[in-house]
Amino acid sequence: MIELSATAYAAELQRFKLRGRVWLASKDIPADVQVPTAWRALLDMRDAALETSLAKMWAGVVDRLPAVRQFFDEKLRRPAVLQKENGDLCLLYPYTVDHDDLNFFIGHPPLGDLVSDDMPLWRALPDDLRSFYQLAHNGWTFFPANSMGPLPIGDQTALTAKLDLTPDETRALGVNPDLVWTVFQNGGGDYLCLDLRDSAGDGSAAGRIWWHDNPAELEPVDFWAVMNAWFEIFVEDADRR
């Protein structure tokens, strides 16, 4: 059975060239490292209280993603704060598979006041997704693939950047690919996107899947339901805590 310690976390991250300092308790964090208050609180929380506290931090979006809430309740191990070599901070969400394979989802600091409704893209995102980016994490994905969760804003692109289509194929998509935004990737080259013409507010009906092996078509889907389903399938083999 794998050891769940700061040393073990750091060693696993280093296997993928991610180096830095890891802390599992807030008392170990140096005074000059400015860690979000909610993250500090998580480090000192009993396992039984983790799900409730994370649900508050993820308010809104966690109700859209019941598989994530179940993951927090049943499979998430002790969270930790990582300070990368460049000084950037992340919140580590560890879990194990077969009790000896340590894995992480990584959450980046929330955007807070760095965004405003004056930004057209920001206004176009679903309300609960905006809340997530602003209050919980600017991206929360499986490491190192940067997949299976909402991508950081800076890693999202218009679908145009993924396409190599003829003009006729582009017209057949039925939507300007500049207005289709990649929000979530499944690690296999496929993207869950938002049609920005209809994504503000609830966002459910604005979901589109772009399959890399069928690049000239977009599949209309329920945005939140697909995100939840893809995540649920991905972590189904994770060990129970």
Region locations from a protein language model:
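A recognition module on extended beta-rich or small alphabeta surfaces enriched in W/G with H and D/E
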Residues: 173-178, 184-241
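A surface-exposed partner-binding patch
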Residues: 1-190, 199
